[in-house]
């Protein structure tokens, strides 16, 4: 029988020494290879010449007469994690040794208990010991049942608000929120103690920011006003200016009002009317002494007087309305009240300015009295054609569809994007049936085709009369204008009268003049003579005549040129 690795077949009869030697070598090789395959780590020993009389029956089976291998010590095998070889083998060609099977988990655990370091070297990582479950974490996972409160109680309302919004605010201060009813109750026990109290006046405030603002606004190193004391306006304005500079805004001090302002005037205007009824507010209204129009603020009344009635006129104290008295007493930017002498000086300056303005009226045009719009210009516009509602509706529909309208007159190619533009065009279109009028100048009755033409005519030809005096100007200014016109008319009349009288005198020289006129003429002649004397005295003194011997003799002029005979 031949082996799997090509062993030499056994022969009958006597064998030589060489044959026995080769047989022993081949058998040893076969046994070594078989032991490597089975992972037994067994070492084979050669057979003795005397004992081996025949060839091995099989390459993988040991000789039955003598043990073919010996085992290492058990300690050495355990140190290298090697299991000792099994004593029995599975017979047959397809049999597999049980040595190659993996050890059960129980044996590995036992080996690990005996040699933990070796276990760590083999597996390459440290195995963590199993942790036991924490009983506290399991207890926390247990969901608590929702608390039950009495129906309609405050606790139930707070609980519903927490479920809805996530927190509930303190009903006392409305500034602190809690997520649980127990926390809210604990806060409410000390809620009154947590409020900030001003050590100046004892006022309780909800937050630290509110306390800081209160101290800054009311106790800013200034004397505190008590009941019955009058407010010093310059001091109050200075205090408000400091608060506004530091905090950036002024808040109303009333508890029910949360208004804030960024200007001192707005704050003072609000404080005067905050918390007052309609009857009190009506008494505080200021009325214009010209037209009686009511205003809620002095600034509004002052603007009305400047825009509608010109500059504010200064009246004596007896005839001045109360509202204007209050306005005149209003403090200026420096905090000083205007004195009476200053008011009188301003009044005289205003009169002088009005007189100068009246003198320069033809040269200078005041901004209010210039003609910025067409209603003040002295010209008339022609009438525009009328259109039916159906035509207008059709034009509007065309604009929505095509975004343009064409002139309906035949031969006209004008296109417009609005109904008003088409209307203005039809008023001046020459291809239509409508005969448009012309623009007429009311100063000289001249007609123009276009509006720009009549405007240019008025601005250039009637430069002094092109504006209309504003009827709402001040009465004092109108009086000055009338007085100036009367003076100019009187001067013109006097000049005309003088010119007529001088002409009459020239035409009638033989008529004797009355004594009054003679005296006037004599006085005039005397004045003329005196003026002549004064002018003569003012002139340089005449030079004395020089004797003839000292005078230079000038050669007579000749018509001959030099160098010619």
Curated annotation (Swiss-Prot):
Query: Which residues are connected by disulfide bridges in this protein?
Result: none
> PROSITE patterns, alphabetically?
ZINC_FINGER_C2H2_1, ZINC_FINGER_C2H2_2
GO CC entries = nucleus
Q: Compositionally biased, Polar residues: which spans?
A: 12-23
Sorted UniProt keywords: DNA-binding, Isopeptide bond, Metal-binding, Nucleus, Repeat, Transcription, Transcription regulation, Ubl conjugation, Zinc, Zinc-finger
Give residue spans, biased composition: Basic and acidic residues: 484-493, 522-531
Residues joined by cross-link Glycyl lysine isopeptide (Lys-Gly) (interchain with G-Cter in SUMO2)? 18, 83, 226, 332
InterPro entries in the cross-refs: Krueppel_C2H2_Zn-finger, ZNF512_C2HC, ZNF512_znf-C2H2, Znf_C2H2_sf, Znf_C2H2_type
Q: Where in the cell is it found?
A: Nucleus
Mapped zinc finger ranges (C2H2-type): 196-219, 286-309, 405-429, 439-462
- Annotated Gene3D superfamilies: Classic Zinc Finger
- Looking at the record's lineage, which domain of life comes first? Eukaryota
Which residues lie within the region annotated Disordered? 1-30, 85-147, 484-565
Q: Which GO terms fall under molecular function for this chain's record?
A: DNA binding; zinc ion binding
UniProt feature, compositional bias: Basic residues: 118-129, 494-507, 554-565
Name the gene that codes for it: ZNF512
**Entry's SMART domains?**
ZnF_C2H2 (SM00355)
What PANTHER family does the annotation carry?
ZINC FINGER PROTEIN 512, ZINC FINGER PROTEIN-RELATED
Protein known as: Zinc finger protein 512
Chain's role: May be involved in transcriptional regulation.
What broad taxonomic lineage does this protein's source fall under? Answer: Eukaryota, Metazoa, Chordata, Craniata, Vertebrata
Mind telling me which Pfam families this protein's record contains?
zf-C2H2, ZNF512_C2HC, ZNF512_zf-C2H2
Q: Which family does it belong to?
A: Belongs to the krueppel C2H2-type zinc-finger protein family.
Record keywords: Signal included?
Answer: no
């Amino acid at each position: 029988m031949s082996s799997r690795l090509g062993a030499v077949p056994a022969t009958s009869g006597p064998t030589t020494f060489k044959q026995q030697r080769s047989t022993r070598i081949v058998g040893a090789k076969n046994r070594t290879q078989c032991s490597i395959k089975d992972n037994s780590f067994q070492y084979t020993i050669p057979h003795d010449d005397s004992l081996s009389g025949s060839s091995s029956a099989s390459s993988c089976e040991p000789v039955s007469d003598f043990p073919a291998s010996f085992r290492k010590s058990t300690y050495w095998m355990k140190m290298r994690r090697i299991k000792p070889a099994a004593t029995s083998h599975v017979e047959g060609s397809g049999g597999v040794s049980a040595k190659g099977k993996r050890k059960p988990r129980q044996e590995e655990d036992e080996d690990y208990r005996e040699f933990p370091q070796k276990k760590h070297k083999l597996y390459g990582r440290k195995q963590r010991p199993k942790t036991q479950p924490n009983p506290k974490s399991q207890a926390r996972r247990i969901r608590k049942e929702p608390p039950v409160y009495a129906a309609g109680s405050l606790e139930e309302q707070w609980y519903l608000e927490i479920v809805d919004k996530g927190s509930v605010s303190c009903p006392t201060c409305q500034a602190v929120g809690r997520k649980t009813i127990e926390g809210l109750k604990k806060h409410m026990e000390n809620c009154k103690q947590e409020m900030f109290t001003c050590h100046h006046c004892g006022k309780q405030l909800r937050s630290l920011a509110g306390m800081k603002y209160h101290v800054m606004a009311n106790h800013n190193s200034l004397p505190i006003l008590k009941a019955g004391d009058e407010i010093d306006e310059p001091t109050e304005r200075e205090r408000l200016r400091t608060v506004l500079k530091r905090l950036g805004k002024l808040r109303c001090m009333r508890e029910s009002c949360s208004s804030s302002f960024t200007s001192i005037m707005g704050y003072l205007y609000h404080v005067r009317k905050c918390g007052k009824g309609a009857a009190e507010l009506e008494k505080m209204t200021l009325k214009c002494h010209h037209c009686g129009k009511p205003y809620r603020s002095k600034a509004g009344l002052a603007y009305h007087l400047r825009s509608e009635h010109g500059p504010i006129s200064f009246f004596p104290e007896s005839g001045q309305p109360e509202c204007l008295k209050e306005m005149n007493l209003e403090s200026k930017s420096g905090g000083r009240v205007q004195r009476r002498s200053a008011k009188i000086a301003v009044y005289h300056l205003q009169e002088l300015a009005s007189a100068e303005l009246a003198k320069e009226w033809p040269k200078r045009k005041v901004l209010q009295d210039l003609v910025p719009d067409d209603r003040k210009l002295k010209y008339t516009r022609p009438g525009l054609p009328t259109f039916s509602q159906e035509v207008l509706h059709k034009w509007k529909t065309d604009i929505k569809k095509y975004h343009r309208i064409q002139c309906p007159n035949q031969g006209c190619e004008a296109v417009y994007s609005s109904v008003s533009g088409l209307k203005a065009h039809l008023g001046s279109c020459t291809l239509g049936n409508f005969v448009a009028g012309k623009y007429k100048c009311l100063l000289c009755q001249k007609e123009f085709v276009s509006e720009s033409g009549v405007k240019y005519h008025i601005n250039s030809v009637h430069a002094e009369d092109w504006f209309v005096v504003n009827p709402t100007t001040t009465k004092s200014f109108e009086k000055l204008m009338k007085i100036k016109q009367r003076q100019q008319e009187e001067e013109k009349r006097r000049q005309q009268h003088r010119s007529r009288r001088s002409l009459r005198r020239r035409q009638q020289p033989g008529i004797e003049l009355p004594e009054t006129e003679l005296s006037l003429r004599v006085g005039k002649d005397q004045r003329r003579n005196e003026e002549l004397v004064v002018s003569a005295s003012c002139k340089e003194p005449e030079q004395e005549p020089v004797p003839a011997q000292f005078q230079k003799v000038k050669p007579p002029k000749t018509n001959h040129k030099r160098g010619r005979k």
